[in-house]
């Protein structure tokens, strides 16, 4: 009887582990897909999107799809997304991120708000490589300019490390994210890469992008006609 019970418990635990692994992989793939859609919208709506000059000067792009749902403020929950940075060989493989806390300045009633953060200089890049940082605490940030001619000003070129944007119903707007914490999503990293990898390893271009991330990498390249992407490799099983 005891042996039977132990076998049942073991089988149940194994089944739950397999279900969690499958769900985690599907969630990570879906996040890549939604992030790609946000990037496509940047290219398709130049008059209402992020200025080309701003994008071309960005060292890293972070996309957090569907930050707000169901008419509630983001609050204490964690949004999750994807980051990639420029390297000598092109855009790096994608790193999985999470974000939470802080004062978002979002209005109740908005649905499907996507967040885009552009890291604009080396100091901001180093903060991102640290695996965890606080916006406006560790890294300076400001709402980014919007529209084809919005980049004419020079404020964003001076000392801002990160420019932040929200997107709702296809329209981009600058947003403040004071106090928000950005950190690595270790679970999704293990799920897609099959091992522990730091932000620094991924975003410095030291690993190739898995094949399951190719759609996202193509979407990133489409935002920058001069960009290239690393050769993809099979996912880790």
Residue ranges and their predicted role:
Residues 7-15:
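Bacterial N-terminal signal peptides
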Residues 16-22:
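Sec/Tat signal peptide C-region and signal peptidase I cleavage site
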Residues 22-237:
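Small-residue-enriched, tightly packed secondary-structure blocks
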